[in-house]
A protein has these predicted regions:
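Glycine-rich loop at the start of a catalytic domain that most often binds anionic cofactors/ligands
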Residues: 54-55, 88
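Active-site neighborhood of divalent metal-dependent phosphoester/pyrophosphate hydrolases
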Residues: 43-50
Length: 239
């Protein structure tokens, strides 16, 4: 039997409505519905804490979609208590999920902003199984090198999707080890697309990669202004 599903990568800027500058779960859920996504990998998501501004954002959006499966991968705790990281929401059961820490550069080589990052690694119960990786890379080259090394070491042998905001343009040589292992679905765009900022994008830093044993039916970055990033969407199929 051929399985066909739609995946979406989305940096939500902690579910901040780009126009109103307020937390807006409805517009995030509506964006997912408009894209018809079955599995969504998020970056810049909050989770529950004592601070009322920190809610279980993946759970809230999943409930608005009527999806029953979600996972939050904590990368950092702001102020030591407020969890922040990546998340996954799925129409299909999540068989397993784990949070893999990306090592911080030590020592730091640059003067820019540094932040601890992580890789969300999950297996979804769809068809014969699908491995999904979600990450948000740092801004500095040494952070990005550590992220690429971590991701490449966790790419499984079959049926894999890697998605996220990698803070790198496609021609960045640091990204090449990923390009060599997986297929960049941007080649299936109907025309070249950029992803950030959402109202007038100047760069493409958001990605969905797939392994060679899945077929890409279509891919796009829709012109949607909800978060500060546009969503990246791909439909794949496999037997």
């Amino acid at each position: 039997m051929i399985m066909k599903i739609t995946l979406m990568s989305y940096n939500t800027q902690h579910c901040l409505n780009y126009v109103t500058r307020k937390i807006d779960f409805d517009i995030m859920a509506d964006t997912i519905k408009r894209c018809g996504a079955d599995i969504i990998g998020f970056q810049e998501m909050r989770d529950q804490s004592q601070d009322p501004a920190y809610e279980a954002q993946a759970k809230i959006i999943a409930e608005k979609l009527g999806y029953h499966y979600y996972y939050f991968a904590e990368a950092i705790r702001f102020a030591g208590v407020n969890p922040y990281g990546n998340a996954l929401i799925s129409r299909y059961p999540i068989l397993s999920a784990e949070t893999v820490r990306i090592p911080d550069p030590d020592p730091r080589k640059y003067d820019g902003y540094y932040e601890t990052r992580c890789l969300l690694k999950a297996t979804i119960d769809v068809g014969s199984g699908l491995h999904v990786l979600v990450s948000h890379f740092g801004l500095n080259p040494d952070e990005q090198e550590n992220a690429v090394e971590t991701v490449v070491s966790h790419i499984p042998a079959d049926r894999c999707v890697l998605m996220g905001d990698f803070n790198m343009k496609p021609d960045n040589p640091i990204l090449q080890p990923v390009m060599q292992k997986l297929c960049d679905t941007a080649q299936y765009f109907p025309s070249p697309k950029l992803s950030f900022p959402s109202d007038s994008p100047r760069v493409k830093i958001d990605y969905i990669f797939v392994s060679s044993d899945v077929n890409v039916c279509c891919a796009d970055i829709p012109e949607i202004v909800s978060s500060d990033h546009r969503p990246h969407v791909v439909t794949i199929e496999w037997e």
